Amino acid sequence: MQNLRNRSFLTLLDFSQKEVEFLLNLSEDLKRAKYAGIEQQKLKGKNIALIFEKDSTRTRCAFETAAYDQGAHVTYLGPTGSQMGKKESAKDTARVLGGMYDGIEYRGFSQRTVEELAKYSGVPVWNGLTDEDHPTQVLADFLTAKEVLKKPYHEINFTYVGDGRNNVANALMQGAAIMGMTFHLVCPKELNPTDELLNRCKEIAAKNGGEILVTDDIDEGVKGSDVIYTDVWVSMGEPDEVWEKRIKLLEPYRVTKEMMEKTGNPRAIFEHCLPSFHDTETKIGKEIQEKYGLTEMEVADEVFESEQSVVFQEAENRAHTIKAVMVATLGE
């Protein structure tokens, strides 16, 4: 058993393969216990602060339900719910909350902010998403892949298609390197990850028997994949000119039925962190259709709704994996 007590969870790069595997195995155990109705509460009497500078469905619900299942109490501080960054620095907020709470989750913009919270609060801090990283998401992604494919992690061929610089792509590449996977990042050259992160991940992968390939060649990149993963192309709030340029760059990289077939693997699955623009059933989806004439963006609705799509199992697993992180770092 790995001792992660009082550790913060800021990036997967802070953890060894054994530690990440321990969290994934614990996630499986906690999920089984919940389904069997025999879950033991390890967080009784704990108070947890959830700081959200960005709105959220899955991350917030996962942290809240996981905490409640384990007997903890939570306080939600939304985008307008605290003074952090406005009247009070992250350093000061950390020291205030650290005196009242046993653990802190942060979902926001800056990786530096979550690092400051961890440095000055004196309690475990968990990264629920920053512009650079999304480590809790990757635990759910990997757990889902193992459940469906029934393969050990190091045998999974994992492929991300789309914007190679975004936080999910960064986090997946880190996680795959640590777990010794074959990881392909398929994206336009203009959207390649930073050399610094890529080189570091390649070094880690080599030590763990994994391999990382970055390519703009879709056929080469998806061949042999067990998992095809994508994420939204543009973040909300980015100007129209960014949307236009990004859509033009990434339209060839939309995950379609043809792309899934190019894997040559009939058992290949589709993953997405959600939300997804796969139809026009949302306000944003309708705006995309009106402005750009598209009824789907990063993934075809045909794939999203197919039997190969495991996105809702993946979403549920956010709760089980986040619960594992909290229990491992804060549990009695």
From Swiss-Prot:
PANTHER family per the UniProt record, alphabetical: ORNITHINE CARBAMOYLTRANSFERASE (PTHR45753:SF2), ORNITHINE CARBAMOYLTRANSFERASE, MITOCHONDRIAL (PTHR45753)
SUPFAM superfamilies, per this entry?
Aspartate/ornithine carbamoyltransferase
Binding of L-ornithine occurs at: N167, D231, S235, M236
Q: What is its main location?
A: cytoplasm
Q: State the function annotated in the UniProt record.
A: Reversibly catalyzes the transfer of the carbamoyl group from carbamoyl phosphate (CP) to the N(epsilon) atom of ornithine (ORN) to produce L-citrulline.
Q: Which Gene3D superfamilies does the annotation name?
A: Aspartate/ornithine carbamoyltransferase
- Entry EC no(s): 2.1.3.3
Task: Specify the superkingdom.
Answer: Bacteria
- InterPro entries linked: Asp/Orn_carbamoyltranf_P-bd, Asp/Orn_carbamoylTrfase, Asp/Orn_carbamoylTrfase_sf, Asp_carbamoyltransf_Asp/Orn-bd, Orn/put_carbamltrans, OTCase_ArgI
What is one GO cellular-component annotation here? cytoplasm
Pathway linked to the protein: Amino-acid biosynthesis; L-arginine biosynthesis; L-arginine from L-ornithine and carbamoyl phosphate: step 1/3
Query: Where along the chain is carbamoyl phosphate bound?
Result: S56, T57, R58, T59, Q83, R107, H134, P135, T136, Q137, C273, L274, R318
GO MF term set: amino acid binding; ornithine carbamoyltransferase activity
**Protein family membership:** Belongs to the aspartate/ornithine carbamoyltransferase superfamily. OTCase family.
* Organism from which the protein derives: Staphylococcus haemolyticus (strain JCSC1435)
Keywords from the named record? Amino-acid biosynthesis, Arginine biosynthesis, Cytoplasm, Transferase
Specify the protein name: Ornithine carbamoyltransferase
Where is the protein situated, by its record's location annotation? Answer: Cytoplasm
| Keyword Disulfide bond (UniProt) | no
Question: Keyword Cytoplasm, does the record have it?
Answer: yes
